[in-house]
């Protein structure tokens, strides 16, 4: 059985306050994008171990046990005593990009296991499991435009459609650590809340729908800011870094052709339509 976990972008990201536990409260909108990995499972009843993980495409560092698709399997196996499986994961969503690739893989793994083994878990139940794997994992269970707050784990659906808009996602060969991203963050409530800003026409978003991490990340990694500026020069109606980076996306009007640009070596580029 196979499924195709998709990426997400952040539409605005406001760091509103620092919490007593050291984490930060934020507001953002998660929006699904048709940039996809491929995830397949095959049962292996005679296998001498619970799982085997086979990875293809973009290289993923770390031990297999630390991969979120494995953690998702072990999470459900602990309760439902699942049959041993082979996991085949083809990575096309870059990691460390702010696109939620690992979280999406985990959420889609939960949904795949639920269907394959007929566990009859509801979406609400799957969201609870997903939330234990990562703050944004639960978003990918319903996989629809969502307003997120708290530490990115409190969700409410929003009536937003960008259907037809073209999207260009660029990720330079740059890694942004969480510590770097938060280094110069000054929590505040923006003039336009995320919820208010997204109600405005997309061509007004440039000045009012802001990702607070850009002020912290761009001075440390100027190439990311340069990509955003170039997307605007090439006609994007809105451009932003996604999450804490390092990918940047541009939204383009439904009509017309996306620009052909040489973004340099070791740069990931995705063109698609929302």
Curated annotation (Swiss-Prot):
Keywords: ATP-binding, Isoprene biosynthesis, Kinase, Nucleotide-binding, Transferase. One of its GO terms (molecular function) is ATP binding. It catalyses: 4-CDP-2-C-methyl-D-erythritol + ATP = 4-CDP-2-C-methyl-D-erythritol 2-phosphate + ADP + H(+). SUPFAM superfamilies: GHMP Kinase, C-terminal domain, Ribosomal protein S5 domain 2-like. It is an enzyme of class 2 (transferase). GO terms for biological process: isopentenyl diphosphate biosynthetic process, methylerythritol 4-phosphate pathway; terpenoid biosynthetic process. The active site is at residues 8, 136. ATP binds at residues 94-104. Its EC number is 2.7.1.148. Pathway: Isoprenoid biosynthesis; isopentenyl diphosphate biosynthesis via DXP pathway; isopentenyl diphosphate from 1-deoxy-D-xylulose 5-phosphate: step 3/6. Pfam families: GHMP_kinases_C, GHMP_kinases_N. Catalyzes the phosphorylation of the position 2 hydroxy group of 4-diphosphocytidyl-2C-methyl-D-erythritol. Belongs to the GHMP kinase family. IspE subfamily. This is 4-diphosphocytidyl-2-C-methyl-D-erythritol kinase. The lineage of its organism: Bacteria, Pseudomonadati, Bacteroidota, Bacteroidia, Bacteroidales. The gene is ispE.
């Amino acid at each position: 059985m196979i499924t195709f976990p998709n990426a997400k972008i952040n539409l605005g990201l406001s760091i509103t306050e620092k919490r007593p536990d050291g984490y930060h409260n934020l507001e953002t909108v998660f929006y699904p994008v048709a940039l996809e990995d491929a995830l397949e499972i095959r049962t292996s009843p005679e296998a001498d171990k619970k799982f085997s993980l086979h990875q293809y495409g973009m290289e993923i560092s770390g031990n297999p046990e630390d991969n979120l698709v494995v953690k998702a399997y072990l999470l459900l196996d602990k309760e439902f005593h699942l049959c041993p499986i082979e996991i085949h994961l083809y990575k096309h969503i870059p990691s460390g990009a702010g696109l939620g690739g690992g979280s999406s893989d985990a959420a889609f793994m939960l949904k795949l296991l639920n269907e394959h083994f007929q566990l009859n878990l509801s979406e609400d139940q799957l969201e609870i499991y997903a939330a234990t794997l990562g703050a944004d994992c639960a978003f990918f269970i319903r996989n629809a435009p969502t307003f997120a707050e708290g530490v990115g784990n409190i969700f409410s659906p929003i009536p937003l459609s960008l259907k037809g808009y073209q999207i260009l996602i660029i990720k330079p060969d740059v890694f942004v650590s969480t510590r770097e991203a938060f280094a110069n963050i000054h929590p505040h409530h923006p003039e336009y809340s995320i919820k208010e800003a997204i109600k405005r026409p997309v061509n007004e978003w440039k000045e009012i729908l802001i990702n607070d991490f850009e002020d912290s990340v761009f001075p440390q990694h100027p190439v990311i800011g340069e990509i955003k500026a170039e997307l605007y020069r090439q006609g994007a109606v809105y451009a932003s870094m996604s999450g804490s980076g390092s990918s940047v996306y541009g939204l383009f009007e439904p009509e017309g052709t996306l620009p052909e640009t040489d973004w340099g070596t070791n740069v990931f580029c995705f063109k698609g339509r929302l």
